[in-house]
Swiss-Prot record:
HAMAP family: IGPS_B (MF_00134_B). GO terms for biological process: L-tryptophan biosynthetic process. Keywords: Amino-acid biosynthesis, Aromatic amino acid biosynthesis, Decarboxylase, Lyase, Tryptophan biosynthesis. GO terms for molecular function: indole-3-glycerol-phosphate synthase activity; phosphoribosylanthranilate isomerase activity. This is Indole-3-glycerol phosphate synthase. The keyword Lyase applies. InterPro entries: Aldolase_TIM, Indole-3-glycerol_P_synth, Indole-3-glycerol_P_synth_dom, Indole-3-GlycerolPSynthase_CS, RibuloseP-bd_barrel. Pathway: Amino-acid biosynthesis; L-tryptophan biosynthesis; L-tryptophan from chorismate: step 4/5. It is an enzyme of class 4 (lyase). CDD domains: IGPS (cd00331).
Length: 255
């Protein structure tokens, strides 16, 4: 793949969406609201634990993982939500993984994909997602707002992902309640945890904020803990010798 990761991925998503049909709505899976949970549990840094077999930057990470066992370990050790990669081409995920995991855990599940169309949102909801991801860099603001409103009208929560100040301002403008700061540049796929620290100076009171990517150790987590409600962690958990211990290590006590 070229260095321009995001445009390449979005081109592929356009092809995939053209082949999707709009599914009939199935009942929304019942669990707690992530926003409410993060607002009311601020004594520690909450973990969004990810099931991810591969990525464009890392290549194969853990192809042989038992996805349900991994998800259950996350849940048993206090994860606030499980993020499930559903992108097939670039992350070796699958919508079926979301279906499997969602039937086996009680906590919220995030459909982690590059969503550009309502059909993807309905498919994710029907597969058991209670939260979807919308990436500011992937969509014009008006379209982002349309998809955000569509998702919330279906009872879903939305993690709105940003990477820089203009994108954070967009997330604030559309009224996002759950905002992610991705420490990974989606054009180059390079990471810098300082992205989270720099943007945290522009946070508002109402939303909750999640730091994403480039968090591997308790020391990394401690850097962002004073400013964020939670962190999204994939690679560090998928490669850990002791997954339970790694989840606990990242749950920084905020007092």
């Amino acid at each position: 793949m070229s260095k321009a990761f995001l445009p390449t991925i979005l081109e592929q998503k356009g092809k995939e969406v053209s082949q999707l049909v709009m599914e009939d709505l199935q009942p929304l899976r019942q669990t707690y609201r992530l926003y409410d949970f993060l607002k009311s549990n601020q004594n520690k840094l909450q973990i969004i634990s990810e099931v991810k077999k591969a990525s464009p930057s890392m290549g194969d990470i853990n192809l042989d993982v038992d996805i349900v066992a991994q998800a259950k370990t996350y849940e048993e050790n206090g994860a606030a939500m499980i993020s499930v990669l559903t992108d097939e081409v670039f992350f070796k995920g699958d919508i079926s993984y979301l279906k499997e995991i969602s039937t086996q855990v009680a906590i919220p599940t995030l459909a982690k994909d590059f969503i550009i169309d309502e059909k993807q949102i309905v498919r994710s909801r029907n597969a058991g997602a209670t939260v979807i991801l919308l990436i500011v860099a992937a969509l014009p603001e008006a379209r982002l707002k349309e998809l955000y409103d569509f998702a919330t009208s279906l009872g879903l929560e939305v993690l709105v992902e940003t990477h820089n100040l203009p994108e954070l301002e967009v997330a604030h403008r559309i009224g996002a309640e759950i905002i992610g700061v991705n420490n990974r540049n989606l054009v180059t796929f390079e990471t810098d945890i300082n992205t989270s620290l720099e943007l945290s100076t522009h946070f508002k009171d109402k939303p909750v904020y999640i730091s994403e990517s480039a968090i591997f150790t308790g020391q990394d987590a401690a850097l962002v803990a004073p400013y964020f409600n939670g962190i999204l962690v994939g690679t560090a958990l998928m490669t850990a010798d002791n997954v339970a211990k790694k989840v606990k290590e990242l749950q920084i006590d905020k007092g």
